[in-house]
Amino acid sequence: MPPNLTGYYRFVSQKNLEDYLQALNVNMALRKIALLLKPDKEIDQRGNHMTVKTLSTFRNYVLEFEVGVEFEEDLRTVDGRKCQTIVTWEEEQLVCVQKGEVPNRGWRLWLEEEMLYQEVTARDAVCQCVFRKVK
């Protein structure tokens, strides 16, 4: 049975974000802003229905989906693209595959005690983010 990721998580650290944003062809000005942000995550998991919110002072992003059901994701607020997305469980990790213009794009989320780990990929770039559960 997959873990319940429901909760509010505060940003702790990130590694390799600029390379990831460059792989998405995000312009330098937006990359510099993104590097200053410390976004929080809010996750609501109700069975196979999930809402994952990325919250920051600059921009918020809300992703709502059914696990295992492919959908069109509008990433215009992130990098100006749309893609076909599917999110599934692999063991205890929530895994997202985003098919579109950018190869090898997606992310993974998993819990280790009170820490939420996120790994995002695009092309050959891999970025790791860590969040601490606060409620």
UniProtKB/Swiss-Prot annotation:
One Pfam assignment: Lipocalin
Keyword Kinase: no
A GO biological-process term: fatty acid transport
InterPro entries registered for this protein in UniProt: Calycin, Fatty_acid-bd, ILBP, Lipocln_cytosolic_FA-bd_dom
SUPFAM superfamilies (alphabetical): Lipocalins (SSF50814)
GO cellular component annotations of the record: cytosol; nucleus
Main location: cytoplasm
Top-level lineage group: Eukaryota
PANTHER family: FATTY ACID BINDING PROTEIN
Name of the protein: Retinol-binding protein 5
